[in-house]
Amino acid sequence: PTPIGNLQEMTPRALDILKEVSVIAAEDTRNTKKLLIAYGIDTMLMSHHEHNQQVSIPKIIERLENGEDVAVVSDAGYPLVSDPGQKLVQETILHGFNVVSVSGANAAMNALVASGLSCYHYLFYGFLDNKSSKRKKQLEEIKTIPYTTIFYEAPHRIEDTLQDMLEVLGNRQMCLARELTKVHEEYIRGTIEEVLEVASTCKGEMVIVMDGFKKEEVVFDMYTAITKVDEYVESGMRTKEAIGLVAKEMACKKNELYEAYHKR
């Protein structure tokens, strides 16, 4: 792993490995070159990323077959964790070569332990889809998971993503961590609505740490749900839309509510 913001995050072991291997396969050789120059390392670099892996993987395997050692790095943090590298690891193992991981910086873990939310059980999700409709569907799939969930997000999408989270997950507790280990490192803690109030001013790479689903958040009974559907219908909403909205609000199954509503 390479630094996520602070150059001193490079461990002595990681530096030794970068010095000792025959070649370093880098997501962006320009970024990695700056890191190597800072530490006086002159190991050969080769490009390996999502768009050239069909060519780069066979070259790396060939080097391994010739008895060489190869290090794989991403631009920041761990390779494979929301970064390229999985196919290379799989191919390396299939060809009978050993793969080891080196400890280092990770934005998700930094954000989690400083979030104030539970660290006992957690889910790392990474990036949600950049389209709202698909993003909401992804959130629907995990909204009843009771564990703290960690997402990565880009600054230009942060408001839209938080709005979708508010709509699907409800107004949960969360922490927005940005610019981790850099000069302007910041943790914004509160409900989704509270964080949304300042999200438009936030810049830099971001980590969202979201509280897990809590059963006590939803006190569900079918009578209340049907009553709420009636209220929405009386206000002018179509029945199907009202049932869908109430099902989301009360975390119940839409088909069960639909059946109960029309059988009453």
Residue ranges: model-predicted function:
Residues 63, 133-150:
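A charged, well-structured terminal subsegment
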Residues 1-51:
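Glycine-rich, flexible N-terminal cofactor/catalytic loop recognition
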Residues 18-24, 96-100, 148-149:
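Short active-site oxyanion
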Residues 4-5, 75-79, 155-157, 213-215:
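Short glycine-rich anion-binding loops that position phosphate/pyrophosphate groups of nucleotides
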Residues 65-125, 129:
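Short glycine-cluster motifs
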